[in-house]
Amino acid sequence: MASKDEILAGLAEIVNEETGLETEAVQLEKSFTEDLDIDSISMMTIVVNAEEKFDVTIPDEEVKNLKTVEDAVNFIDNAQA
């Protein structure tokens, strides 16, 4: 099971691969859409890659609730438990 720091680092790598954003730009308080400028198609790719990386399921109806990086980290952390 990954720690929250490991989840954040893993998400940063996934966002970097999908968008080209520097991993340092992916911080807990950042909004996926407003701060990181991630569109819905890229977000779905990020979600699928996160599901594979962390061996969790993120239901489609939950994706809209993942507004910030911290939301995603917390969801993945809870889903691993």
Swiss-Prot record:
Query: Residues in domain Carrier?
Result: 2-80
Signal peptide (residue range) = none
Q: Main subcellular localization, coarse class? A: cytoplasm
Q: What pathway is it annotated to?
A: Lipid metabolism; fatty acid biosynthesis
Q: Which GO terms describe its molecular function?
A: acyl binding; acyl carrier activity
**Any one Gene Ontology biological process term?**
lipid A biosynthetic process
What does the UniProt record tell us about how this protein is modified after translation?
Answer: 4'-phosphopantetheine is transferred from CoA to a specific serine of apo-ACP by AcpS. This modification is essential for activity because fatty acids are bound in thioester linkage to the sulfhydryl of the prosthetic group.
Superkingdom field: Bacteria
What are the entry keywords?
Answer: Cytoplasm, Fatty acid biosynthesis, Fatty acid metabolism, Lipid biosynthesis, Lipid metabolism, Phosphopantetheine, Phosphoprotein
Q: Name one GO cellular component term.
A: cytosol
Compartment(s) of residence: Cytoplasm
Instruction: Return the Pfam families for the record.
Output: PP-binding
Q: What InterPro entries does the record tag this protein with?
A: ACP, ACP-like_sf, PP-bd_ACP
Modified positions (O-(pantetheine 4'-phosphoryl)serine) are 40
Question: In which family does this protein belong, per the annotation?
Answer: Belongs to the acyl carrier protein (ACP) family.
Report the protein's function.
Answer: Carrier of the growing fatty acid chain in fatty acid biosynthesis.
Report the protein name in the record: Acyl carrier protein
Protein species of origin:
Kocuria rhizophila (strain ATCC 9341 / DSM 348 / NBRC 103217 / DC2201)
Organism classification, top ranks?
Bacteria, Bacillati, Actinomycetota, Actinomycetes, Micrococcales
Q: Which gene encodes it?
A: acpP
